[in-house]
Swiss-Prot record:
Homodimer. NCBIfam families: carboxy-S-adenosyl-L-methionine synthase CmoA, PRK15451.1. The gene is cmoA. Catalyzes the conversion of S-adenosyl-L-methionine (SAM) to carboxy-S-adenosyl-L-methionine (Cx-SAM). This is Carboxy-S-adenosyl-L-methionine synthase. It comes from Pseudomonas putida (strain ATCC 47054 / DSM 6125 / CFBP 8728 / NCIMB 11950 / KT2440).
């Protein structure tokens, strides 16, 4: 499947609409996220490696906010526990349709992959099966802040002893100087990947009302409040990080 370059915000828009994961975004999403999120390929590949340590035979592995299924593909490449299956969930019909196409292509290239179920659903209303691994890769930041604790609490209840939640998020920082520095470095990263000042400004306008990052401290406190016993940051690149939360 051909991957198109992200030019969604390359032309001046009279009014910049809020960002949505529609068909236009789906077409360019692999290019967009690679050029926008520092360390993204490293996070995705190692999510599978981490999951292999925590996956337990006969359990569900969740990819919540699966988008095009990059994390699901990583889980299927690395996890070998008997009887496991991946449940990939996204609320965007366009994402789900393309995700299924990518996973079908993966099935044609590899043997003995974990079975996968792709659901178009709202994770806030999703009943969770007993799970040994739950991955949320840049998903929680799009959930309304007042609904995040309840969601994490339900995930904690579904996690089996010895399992793990792997949570990746964009961070904000309480220290103003630290926030300004890492924000500017992130903008430099985007410029180095070919985004113009117009594209950067219009994308920021589109996403600022729908994505609400938290501080690392807020994530840690919320995860503990949800019932997790240990929170371990395992990766950070600029203002993007990933955590392992243990039940």
């Amino acid at each position: 499947m051909s991957k198109q370059p992200d030019r969604l915000f390359s032309q001046p828009l009279e009014q910049v609409p809020d960002f949505v994961f529609n068909e236009d975004v789906v077409r360019v999403f692999p290019d967009m996220i690679k050029r926008s999120v520092p360390g993204y390929p490293t996070i995705v590949e190692n999510l599978g490696v981490l999951a292999a340590r925590f996956a337990q035979p006969g359990t569900a592995l969740y990819d919540l906010g699966a988008s095009l299924g990059a994390v699901t593909q990583s889980l299927r490449r690395h996890v070998r526990s008997d009887g496991c299956r991946v449940i990939a969930v996204d609320n965007s019909a366009a994402m789900v349709e393309r995700c299924r196409q990518y996973l079908t292509a993966q099935d044609s290239m590899f043997q003995e992959l974990l079975p996968v179920q792709v659901l178009e659903a709202d994770i806030l209303a999703l009943p969770f099966e007993p799970a040994s691994v739950v991955a949320m890769n840049f998903t929680l930041q799009f959930i309304a802040p007042d609904q995040r604790l309840e969601l994490l609490g339900r995930i904690r209840q579904a996690l089996l002893p010895g399992g793990a939640l792997i949570l990746s998020e964009k961070l904000r920082f309480a220290d103003e100087q630290e926030q300004d520095l890492l924000n500017e470095l992130h903008l430099d990263f985007k410029r180095a990947n070919g985004y113009s000042e117009l594209e950067i400004a219009q994308k920021r306008s589109a996403i600022e009302n729908v994505m609400k990052p938290d501080t690392l401290e807020t994530h840690q406190e919320r995860l503990r409040a949800a019932g997790f016993s240990k929170v371990v940051p395992w990766f950070q690149c600029l203002n993007f990080a990933s955590l392992i939360a243990l039940p």
